[in-house]
């Protein structure tokens, strides 16, 4: 079920404060966050946000096409190692 329009998008308070401070100063620094559930809003465009994937922070450069999506969508948590080439058990 989608979030109510009346409530507006969820963005972590600490993330909003950091972005507003950088926008006021006109700086472009990497912002480190663990908030994967935060929605990307237009004020984040042009910033690089390092999103935690459970092991490390992956840098995500925010563009205008990303607005409305969650930060966690751009930092995958699982690594795909590939299928085994000669797996005789699965062929039976």
Swiss-Prot record:
Membrane as a keyword of this entry, yes or no, is no
Which biological process terms from the Gene Ontology are attached to this UniProt entry?
ribosomal small subunit assembly; translation
State the GO CC annotations.
Answer: chloroplast; mitochondrial small ribosomal subunit
Task: State whether keyword Transcription regulation applies.
Answer: no
**Source organism's superkingdom?**
Eukaryota
What is the protein's known function? Protein S19 forms a complex with S13 that binds strongly to the 16S ribosomal RNA.
| This protein's name | Small ribosomal subunit protein uS19c
Q: Which organism is it from?
A: Chaetosphaeridium globosum (Charophycean green alga)
Gene assigned in the entry? rps19
């Amino acid at each position: 079920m989608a979030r109510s329009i009346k409530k507006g998008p969820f963005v972590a308070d600490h993330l909003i404060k950091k972005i507003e401070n950088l926008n006021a100063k006109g700086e472009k620094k990497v912002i480190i966050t663990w908030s994967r559930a935060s929605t990307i809003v237009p004020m984040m465009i042009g910033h690089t946000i390092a999103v935690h994937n459970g092991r490390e922070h992956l840098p995500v450069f925010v563009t205008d096409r990303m607005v409305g999506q969650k930060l966690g969508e751009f930092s995958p948590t699982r690594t795909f190692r590939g299928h085994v080439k000669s797996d005789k058990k699965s062929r039976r």
